[in-house]
């Protein structure tokens, strides 16, 4: 305590860092496909609507967190052990006009393919909503194209 204020004694403060969000219900979800999106609320809502596991990234630039850690302990390894065969990337629909979002999507797709996952890119008409949550709330589902 300093002059009536609590003071963090850790150098640089308390840092939570950017974390991945995992959303799944093993008793209900179809573990064949795993969805990756940006934003916690999109992951929660997407899993509930599509009945498939979701991982939410804190931002599209943080996709490499899926591959952090030792082999066998990474997020991608966890989903492989759950029986996931295809990964569907559902970044926001503005990827068609936002070069940075598109670039990060393509980097993620390439890395997932290096890990031997089948990869699909979720697409929808942007007029139906920017994010997967908007699309689902409007009563629609994404289509996806498999990447070779």
Model-predicted segments: where are they?
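Phosphate-handling DNA/RNA-contact segment within nucleic-acid enzymes
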Residues: 1-83
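Acidic beta-strand-to-loop metal/phosphate-binding motif
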Residues: 34-36, 85-99
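Residues at the starts of beta-strands that form the adenosine-phosphate
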Residues: 53, 86, 118
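Short, flexible/disordered intra-domain loops and linkers
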Residues: 64-70, 96-104
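Short, aromatic/basic amphipathic alpha-helical patches
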Residues: 99-115
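Acidic carboxylate-rich catalytic motifs and surrounding loops in phosphoryl-/glycosyl-chemistry enzymes
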Residues: 120-130
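Short, small/acidic-rich helices and loops at N termini and domain boundaries
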Residues: 128-148
């Amino acid at each position: 305590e300093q002059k009536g204020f609590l003071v963090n004694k850790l150098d640089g403060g308390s840092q939570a860092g950017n974390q991945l969000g995992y959303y799944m219900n093993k008793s209900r979800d179809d573990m064949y496909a795993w969805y990756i999106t940006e934003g916690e609320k999109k992951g929660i809502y997407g899993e509930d609507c599509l009945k498939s596991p979701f991982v939410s990234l804190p931002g599209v630039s943080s996709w490499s967190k899926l591959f952090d850690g030792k082999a066998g302990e990474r997020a991608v390894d966890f989903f492989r052990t759950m029986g996931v065969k295809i990964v569907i990337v559902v970044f926001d629909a503005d990827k068609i006009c936002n070069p940075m979002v598109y670039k990060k999507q393509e980097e993620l797709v390439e890395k997932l393919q290096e890990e031997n996952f089948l990869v699909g890119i979720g697409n929808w008409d942007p007029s139906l909503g920017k994010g997967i949550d908007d699309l689902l709330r409007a009563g629609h589902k994404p289509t996806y194209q498999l990447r070779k």
